[in-house]
Structure formats: structure tokens, C-alpha cells
């Protein structure tokens, strides 16, 4: 089943059509342009409910359901994007070969990265700067919803990460107010399984 989805995602990418799919952890449909596909994750230029580009999302191929190509409302969406002068300046150079490579490349290109652990913690996300990635875990210096950096970074299991977002309006607003974090002291690093 995942292989059939990959074929359809590659079709969406090569034909530059808007994809629409349902994701079991979100309410409603997700819409966007598929920009690249890796072994596990694919890169999507997200089109939000206001018919505007709103950053990028990397979803697990195995998590998407009811993929529609093209989006049944593609003509309307394309016309609205055009009228609003919405465009993607360029595809970000995100390495999708593995989750650690994805996280490192997104962290290098964008000021903040959002991770989701939708199976373990539905409805929650964690936003911050990647400090370190090991074979099994991610060390993330997190920022709270008030744009205040936590004093200690948190560790997350890579196996629990189901989605990675970056370049969206919310991440940009947090960075605008919170700025860059001060480097944490090694002795204060929080551990998370």
C-alpha cells in the first residue's frame, strides 16, 4: 500500500498538481504541492485554509490516507493563489534520505523546526532548534507558545516522530519575537527517553 502511495506522490511531484489527502491525526484535509519524496517522508508545500502557502511539512508516506490527485478543487485553489500572488520562491533543499538528515537540513535552512509525535502525543507539537541527533534521539532546544526559550533542551525519540514542519507563519512569528536561543550549558540538558 505504501508503495502505491509513493507512486502517486511521485506523479503529483512530477506533474506539479495539488495533492489532497487525509491524515489520521488531523481534522480535515491537507492540501499542497508535493516537492520531493524520500524513503519514508515526503516534502509538501502546505496550502492552508486561507488558500495561502504556509511553510513546509514532511509527512510519513505510510500515514497518509485517501490521496486525491489532483485536488478536486485544484482550479479554484490555483486561481486563488495566483490572484493573491502566492508562490514558492524555491524548493528548500531538504534531505529526505533519513529522519536525521531531514531534521539537520531543515534546521540548517530555517530558524525553527516543529516536530510531531502524533501516535504517542496526539495534538501536541514541539518547536525549537535542533542541537544534536543521535542514532535514536533528537535533542531540541524548545520555545514555548509565548516565544520564550526553555532553559533546558529536551530529548525526543526519533522513532516517535511522525511529522516535521518548518517555514510556516507560526514558526516565523515565534522566531520574530523569541529570536535565537542562548546556547544551553551541557550540564543542564534534560533527558527524555
What are these regions (language model features)?
Residues 1-29, 47-123, 144-193:
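Short glycine-rich, low-complexity segments
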